[in-house]
């Protein structure tokens, strides 16, 4: 009798050990806005731990509080950088910047007080979405939807342009963060 009870008990234990537990999604606990305001200097955008790239918006820098490229108090975008430092308190990287545009643009950063200066655009917090590895917003000046994503080695950008014959993407190799600038860069055309 003991043997008969013992076998079903072992069978039940083995069946329980074989079932796989559903892994918990810890990304639901991430608040990507922590540290993005005041003196936090934390980067906002699409990145993953120890990733090669950090894609995200770059605002018009006003003080050293913008040294990560983003400050929650600001709703301007001058481009989407592919390398950012986070939490350092000093500007660096952000050297490769893409800015989707529609129509005639004035190259350069411009100033937040003058909408006709530079190629910058405003965005709305209502349109902004950020999660681990993902960032999205809408450029109000151009009507362009922006989505950025990152993996450990690669970043991807997707731009949804309105119907236009005059849409483009500006590649800014002179971009830098705050007082930091690229000093020696260029483009070499390898083929047609």
Region spans (language model):
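Bacterial N-terminal signal peptides
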Residues: 8-16
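Bacterial N-terminal signal peptides that target proteins for export
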Residues: 1-7
């Amino acid at each position: 009798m003991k043997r008969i009870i013992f076998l079903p008990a072992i069978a039940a234990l083995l069946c329980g050990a074989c079932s796989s537990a559903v892994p918990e999604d810890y990304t639901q606990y991430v608040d990507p806005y922590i540290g993005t305001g005041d003196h936090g200097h934390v980067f906002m955008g699409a990145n993953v731990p120890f990733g090669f790239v950090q894609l995200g918006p770059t605002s018009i820098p006003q003080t050293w509080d913008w040294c990560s490229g983003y400050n929650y108090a600001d709703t301007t975008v001058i481009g989407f950088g592919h390398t950012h430092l986070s939490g350092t308190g000093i500007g660096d990287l952000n050297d490769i910047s893409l800015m989707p545009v529609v129509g005639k643009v004035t190259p350069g950063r411009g100033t937040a007080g003058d909408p006709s200066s530079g190629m910058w655009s405003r965005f709305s917090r209502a349109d902004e979405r950020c999660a681990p590895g993902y960032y999205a917003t809408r450029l109000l000046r151009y009507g362009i939807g922006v989505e950025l994503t990152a993996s450990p080695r690669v970043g991807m950008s997707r731009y949804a342009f309105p119907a236009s014959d005059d849409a483009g993407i500006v590649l800014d190799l002179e971009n830098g963060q705050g007082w930091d600038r690229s000093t020696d860069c260029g483009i070499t055309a390898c083929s047609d």
